[in-house]
Amino acid sequence: MSSHEGGKKKALKQPKKQAKEMDEEEKAFKQKQKEEQKKLEVLKAKVVGKGPLATGGIKKSGKK
């Protein structure tokens, strides 16, 4: 009987590459993303306090 190995020979996950030095552009981009995220969180907090702006869902008519 021949031995049959199942699965893949190669590892599924590639080894992590060394963290390269970030360029100034990359640093600026990440900083901008963080600022945008903070702004969104502040806006979400304000909206939660006010309640629903529009009631969605099924509209019921007064007729029976």
Curated annotation (Swiss-Prot):
Superkingdom assignment: Eukaryota
Cited InterPro entries: TMA7
Compositional bias segments (type: Basic and acidic residues): 27-38
Residues covered by region (Disordered): 1-38
Family recorded in the similarity comment: Belongs to the TMA7 family.
Protein name stated in the entry: Translation machinery-associated protein 7B
Organism: Homo sapiens (Human)
Species lineage: Eukaryota, Metazoa, Chordata, Craniata, Vertebrata
